[in-house]
Swiss-Prot record:
This is Histidine--tRNA ligase, cytoplasmic. Belongs to the class-II aminoacyl-tRNA synthetase family. PANTHER family: HISTIDINE--TRNA LIGASE, CYTOPLASMIC, HISTIDYL-TRNA SYNTHETASE. GO terms for biological process: histidyl-tRNA aminoacylation; mitochondrial translation. Residues 3-59 form the WHEP-TRS domain. One of its GO terms (cellular component) is cytoplasm. It holds the Pfam family HGTP_anticodon. Keywords: Aminoacyl-tRNA synthetase, ATP-binding, Cytoplasm, Ligase, Nucleotide-binding, Phosphoprotein, Protein biosynthesis.
Length: 508
């Protein structure tokens, strides 16, 4: 039997191996294999995890949210949902996990990022990777061919988390989609309009929406001489141009993916171009692209899209970018990405941009699930709210802005001891009328402490009840900000609070 010191040495060696693979970004299968070996070794050595010191923390790539953070998130959601409803959307929900077969074959290389669950009653299940594939399954199951919907829920991805940039292993995704047969590019333009409305309303800084089309990409690769079998892998290289230089991308395509240098150079002539509708018109006259049917169809749709964007007054926020090459296997036509542009705040800092939303047209997804292969044209957007939350939180911290974590409108306070439940009755009266009210759960609270509590939590009004007020049938209503006090008859209290807080006459 090996000594405890030797056992610990072997275990530490295995731990270092697993950590090294993760740092090198090895394949998920290789990491899982080494983790399985490590767990097996622990079992063989009788390694008791319970004897080790337990560290109380959230799992890597996850976090808790404080009341202050949740208040910020709710305000962001209010802006987003208000916009969706303004555009006539309905809301749906789907299970947090799907049959594994439903998700497989929809995400290309990203399939390795899907969380699989243990076998449950003979069904192989996986946590949802996004909200779009479940939506496609929902449409096919219910034989729906026309709907405008939004869905806000968590998705799960075994990715490398970047907490400071709002990238987590489980994150909230906000989707808005339009399914149905409509005139070309009108739903696409509305999706772009919605994203611009939301980002402008949130006031999180400058942003730019990049657009391209999968048909233009495929046509471009074809005329450049890229073999069909390499379309998707070359696509993933091109999409890195927002992070690295063209030379690095070219070296990857030639050195790692076996593309001929002259083919890579032809691709480079195209993908380094970006601009407005004039670039679309220029490419329609391109001697090579103009001979490719897919590219011409994509360019024609983009030209029409820019006409609607001009009509909607958002064309100045849109850029046609040929390097935009991302997209999952079910994406078909126009693709879009919204990026936030954060300018440097100090000397030596570089400007950076971060994706906060994307669009996609996926006309063939529903047909993958429909027994008869019937297609339902779909276009939609996804908003990366986790990144938006991070930016809003950082902005509020920098401004030292106070955030209210409750919506209490009035605190019912007592001025003396033993008031025979007068403050409780007043609070019940307010609750029954739909007023957001609270009182402190203490028998003899000091009035000064109650007023201080209002200042700390941002409660705007205090309803003060004392012995004299009870005798006179009035309640003293105090403004916390101005410290102005006025006597209000008990039967008029609800109306006076509503007037001061601009609350409508209905119960929340």
């Amino acid at each position: 039997m090996a000594s405890p010191a030797l056992e610990e040495l072997v275990l530490n060696s295995r731990h270092r191996l697993v950590r090294g693979l993760k740092q090198q970004k090895a394949s998920a299968d290789q990491i899982e294999e080494e983790v399985a070996k490590l767990l097996k070794l622990k079992a063989q050595l009788g390694h008791d995890e319970s004897k080790q010191k337990f560290v109380l923390k959230t799992p890597k790539g996850t976090r808790d949210y404080s009341p202050r953070q949740m208040a910020v998130r709710e305000k962001v959601f209010d802006v987003i949902i208000c916009c969706f409803k303004r555009h006539g959307a309905e809301v749906i929900d789907t299970p947090v996990f799907e049959l594994k077969e439903t998700l497989m074959g929809k995400y290309g290389q990203d399939c390795k990022l899907i969380y699989d669950l243990k076998d449950q009653g003979g069904e192989l299940l996986s946590l949802r990777y996004d909200l779009t594939v479940p939506f496609g399954r929902y449409l096919a199951m219910n034989n729906l061919t026309n709907i405008k919907r939004y869905h806000i829920a968590k998705v799960y991805r075994r990715d490398n988390p970047a907490m400071t940039r709002g990238r987590y292993l489980n994150s909230i995704t906000v989707d808005f989609d339009i399914a149905g047969q409509f005139d070309p590019m009108i739903p696409d333009a509305e999706c772009l309009k919605i994203m611009c409305e939301i980002l402008s309303s949130l006031q999180i800084g400058k942003f730019l929406v990049k657009v391209n089309d999968r048909r233009i990409l495929d046509g471009m690769f074809a005329v450049c001489g890229v073999p069909d079998s390499k379309f998707r892998t070359i696509c993933s290289s091109v999409d890195k141009l927002d992070k690295v230089s063209w030379e690095e991308v070219k070296n990857e395509m030639v050195g790692e993916k076996g593309l001929a240098p002259e083919v890579a150079d032809r691709i480079g002539d195209y993908v380094q171009q970006h601009g407005e509708v004039c670039l679309v018109e220029q490419l329609l006259q391109d001697p090579k692209l103009s001979q490719n049917k897919q590219a011409v169809e994509g360019l024609g749709d983009l030209k029409l899209l820019f006409e609607y964007l001009t009509l909607f007054g958002i064309d100045d926020k849109i850029s046609f970018d040929l390097s935009l090459a991302r997209g999952l296997d079910y994406y078909t036509g126009v693709i879009y990405v919204a990026v936030l542009l954060q300018m440097p705040t100090g000397a030596g800092e570089e400007p950076w941009c971060g994706q906060c939303g994307c669009w996609r047209r996926y006309d063939g997804l529903v047909g993958m699930f429909d027994p008869k292969g019937r297609k339902v044209p779909c276009v939609g957007l996804s908003i990366g709210v986790e990144r938006i939350f991070s930016i809003v939180e950082q902005r509020l911290e920098a401004l030292e802005e106070k955030v209210r974590t409750t919506e209490t409108q009035v605190l019912v306070a007592s001025a003396q001891k033993k008031l025979a439940g007068g403050e409780t009755k007043a609070c019940l009266q307010l609750w029954d009328a739909g007023i957001k009210a609270e009182l402190l759960y203490k028998k003899n609270p000091k009035l000064l402490n109650q007023l201080q509590y209002c200042e700390e939590t941002g409660i705007p009004l205090v309803a003060i009840i004392g012995e004299q007020e009870l005798k006179d049938g009035v309640i003293k209503l105090r403004s916390v900000a101005s410290r102005e006090e006025v006597d209000v008859r008990r039967e008029d209290l609800v109306e006076e609070i509503r007037r001061r807080t601009n609350q409508p006459l209905y119960v929340c």
